[in-house]
């Protein structure tokens, strides 16, 4: 039982401090560092957060967006990964579920999420 506080203390060193507060249903823009050969560039991925899992260093979230020709694309990111350059909150959404898997079967206006006010 002595291991848990030590692990917790070590993990706290690797937590990011610059992550904004966001929830499931919010629209976020995630900037990811992409390495192509010797070059490194930033690639943005914007979409709706459909899931958040775990806590601490292992916390991750899934973002869904509709790409060209109406094809849905989902990417899962580790929140505290060094590959993530930043997360920007674009829009807040009002939802009542913890996971928005039902959006996978919806397209167009049926996939809209109301905006949370205040």
From Swiss-Prot:
<dbReference type="GO" id="GO:0006412">
    <property type="term" value="P:translation"/>
</dbReference>
<comment type="function">
    <text>This protein is located at the 30S-50S ribosomal subunit interface and may play a role in the structure and function of the aminoacyl-tRNA binding site.</text>
</comment>
<dbReference type="Pfam" id="PF01245">
    <property type="entry name" value="Ribosomal_L19"/>
</dbReference>
<keyword id="KW-0687">Ribonucleoprotein</keyword>
<keyword id="KW-0689">Ribosomal protein</keyword>
<dbReference type="GO" id="GO:0003735">
    <property type="term" value="F:structural constituent of ribosome"/>
</dbReference>
<protein>
    <recommendedName>
        <fullName>Large ribosomal subunit protein bL19</fullName>
    </recommendedName>
</protein>
<dbReference type="InterPro" id="IPR001857">
    <property type="entry name" value="Ribosomal_bL19"/>
</dbReference>
<dbReference type="InterPro" id="IPR038657">
    <property type="entry name" value="Ribosomal_bL19_sf"/>
</dbReference>
<dbReference type="InterPro" id="IPR008991">
    <property type="entry name" value="Translation_prot_SH3-like_sf"/>
</dbReference>
<comment type="similarity">
    <text>Belongs to the bacterial ribosomal protein bL19 family.</text>
</comment>
<dbReference type="GO" id="GO:0022625">
    <property type="term" value="C:cytosolic large ribosomal subunit"/>
</dbReference>
